[in-house]
Amino acid sequence: VAYSVQEVPIEFVNRAWPDVEKFITTSVEYADGEFTLDEVKARLVQGSWALVVAVDESNTVRGVATVAYYNRTDHRVAFVTNFGGKFVSNPDVFSQFASILVSKGATCMEGAVRDSMLRLWARLGARKKSTNIQIIL
C-alpha cells in the first residue's frame, strides 16, 4: 500500500481531528502523563505543534505524527511528540516525513520513545541518544 505523507495546515486541524484522534489517543496512553488528548489538540490548533498524516490512495488517514520544532545552537530540532498508526511503516513513508521536516528548517529529528519504537526506528537509521529521567519536586 502506498501512502502519501502531508502536513495538515493549522486552519484544518479541527476538521482533521475526527480522523486523527484515535491514533493520537493510542500514543497518549504511552506518554506517562506528559500530556492529555485535550492538551495535544490545544497545542495543534494553537500552532505549538504540527500535525502530519499518512493517507492511503482513498485519502483515509492511516498514520499520524505530531511535531514540536525548537532551535539549539547547532540544530533546528523536529521533536516528534506522538506517533500513531502506520506512520513508520517503511522507508518511503519516512522519506516523505523527513522531507516535510526539512522543509520546516529541521536539521535533525528527535523523540522520546519506548524500546519497541526504538527498534522500529533503528531500521531507518535512528540511534539511542540518551535516557531521560524525571523526579517530581
What positions do the PLM features span?
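Short amphipathic alpha-helix that is part of the acyltransferase structural core
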Residues: 1-35
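Active-site rim helix/loop that mediates acceptor-substrate recognition in acyltransferases
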Residues: 29-49
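Structural motif
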Residues: 44, 57, 99-101
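Conserved donor-binding loop and adjoining core beta-sheet/short helix segment
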Residues: 46-88
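Short glycine-aromatic motifs
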Residues: 49, 123-128
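Acyl-donor binding region in acyl/amide transferases
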Residues: 75-124
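Conserved catalytic-core motifs of GNAT/GCN5-like acyltransferases
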Residues: 112, 127-137
